[in-house]
C-alpha cells in the first residue's frame, strides 16, 4: 500500500437519505464478499463512488462511529439481491483491512455529513485514516476478524 494523496469516507446506513430507512452497515461488511454501497441520484457522491479506482482506501462509518477501514477491490456493480437487503443501488467489493473495534474512534464531528467524500492529505480526516493504516502495518491485520458490537 503506497501513500495516497487522498482517502475516502462513506456512510451507507441511510440509503434513502435523511429521514429515510436505516440499515445495519455492518451486515454489508460481513457479507461473504464484503461490499460498500450508495444509492443512485444526481450527485457527485454517487458518480465518484462508481468511478473511484480499485485500491482506494475507504473509511466506513455510521454517523460519527467508525466501523471499518477497507480497500476497494472491484468495479462498481448493481445487484438485485443486495438491493433487496440493503436498499443501496451501487456496490463495490472491498477487502476489510481492519475493524474499528481494534482502533480508536475518531473525535466527534471529525467526518462531515455526506455519503461518499474524499479526504485530501491536508485534512484531519486524512491523518486519522493514515494513522490507522500505519497502526495496521505495525500491529498487522487480523485476517478473519469478526466484529461484535
Predicted ranges, named:
Residues 1-50, 98-102, 123-125, 131, ...:
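Compositionally biased, charged N-terminal/linker segments
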Residues 10, 70-71:
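GIY-YIG nuclease signature motif recognition
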Residues 65, 71-134:
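Aromatic- and Lys/Arg-enriched surface recognition patch
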Amino acid at each position: 500500500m503506497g501513500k495516497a494523496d487522498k482517502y475516502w469516507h462513506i456512510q451507507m446506513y441511510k440509503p434513502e437519505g435523511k429521514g429515510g430507512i436505516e440499515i445495519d452497515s455492518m451486515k454489508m461488511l460481513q457479507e461473504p464478499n464484503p461490499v460498500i454501497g450508495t444509492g443512485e441520484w444526481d450527485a457527485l457522491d454517487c458518480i465518484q463512488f462508481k468511478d473511484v479506482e480499485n485500491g482506494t482506501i475507504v473509511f466506513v462509518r455510521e454517523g460519527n462511529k467508525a466501523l471499518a477501514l477497507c480497500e476497494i477491490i472491484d468495479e462498481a456493480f448493481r445487484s438485485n439481491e443486495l438491493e433487496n437487503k440493503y436498499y443501496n443501488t451501487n456496490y463495490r467489493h472491498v477487502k476489510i483491512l481492519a475493524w474499528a473495534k481494534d482502533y480508536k474512534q475518531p473525535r466527534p464531528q471529525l467526518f462531515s455529513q455526506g455519503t461518499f467524500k474524499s479526504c485530501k492529505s491536508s485534512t484531519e480526516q486524512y491523518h486519522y485514516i493514515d494513522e490507522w493504516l500505519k497502526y495496521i502495518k505495525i500491529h498487522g491485520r487480523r485476517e478473519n476478524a469478526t466484529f461484535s458490537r
